[in-house]
Design a protein with these regions (language model features):
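Generic N-terminal targeting/processing segments that precede catalytic cores or assembly contacts
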Residues: 3-134, 138-231
Length: 231
């Protein structure tokens, strides 16, 4: 209690660190096999999909999201040591958040975090609860996806719904690797392209009113061997 925990996994262990308006954010991946080739161009393609400031549907904050690998990677391959990468923060406007300690934003972590961490948490930009922290998570996911693909496993996702507008759901018994690849190449991934246009219109309308709306993401994995998971 009173400790922010940002790590997941057992055999592959991911720790995400940093805060929205701190000097940097980053990720540490432990347990990666040595000798795994990582194509950094493919990693950067996924980082670009997440990066804000390029579209009205995303936050206007612009960051380069250029991960700098500090350890665990040499000559294009993993070394077996923890893979650590940092992403510098540059476009911060901390003065915009000076009133949050008195007026928490509805629907955000401001108030519960203030209570749980006794007011010592960094509230600037949401601190460690900011969407900014998805950048190192995407880096880690892009690395792990390449390793999984060499083992015949792939993972992908699409926007299932936003504010009452629904996309076509995955067929629970027939999700193809080709579909997952197509979705992972698009900035706003939907199976039904008409749904994307309607969702964008809903987001634009909320943005015009100074509001925000929620959504649901559906994820699928293919090629997982039977019996995987659990104890």
């Amino acid at each position: 209690w009173g400790v922010i925990v940002c790590n997941w996994g057992n055999k592959i262990h991911l720790t995400v660190f940093g805060e929205s308006h701190g000097p940097a954010i980053g990720a540490v991946l432990e347990g990666l096999p040595a000798g795994e080739a990582i194509d950094m161009e493919k990693v950067m393609a996924q980082m670009a999909r997440r990066a804000p400031g390029h579209d009205i549907t995303a936050t206007p904050r612009y960051e380069s999201d250029e991960p700098k690998i500090l350890s665990g990677f040499l000559n294009g391959k993993t070394t077996g040591a923890p893979l650590c990468a940092v992403i510098r923060n540059s476009n911060t406007h901390s003065e915009d958040y000076k009133d949050i300690c008195h007026i928490p934003r509805p629907g955000h972590s401001d108030y519960p975090a203030m209570v749980r961490y006794h007011g010592f948490n960094d509230i600037r930009g949401g601190g460690s609860f900011s969407g900014r922290l998805t950048a190192p998570a995407v880096f880690a996911g892009a690395v792990c996806r390449q390793i999984l693909r060499r083992r015949g496993i792939d993972v992908g996702a699409h926007v299932l719904s936003i504010h009452g507008v629904s996309d076509t759901p995955f067929d629970p018994v027939n999700v193809s690797a080709e579909l997952l690849e197509d979705l992972s190449s698009r900035y706003f991934p939907t199976i039904d392209h008409a749904a994307e246009n309607t969702m964008r219109a809903e987001i634009a309308a909320a943005n015009k009113m100074g509001d925000s709306i929620g959504g649901v993401v559906e994820c699928a994995a293919v090629g997982i061997p039977a019996g995987s998971g659990g104890g």
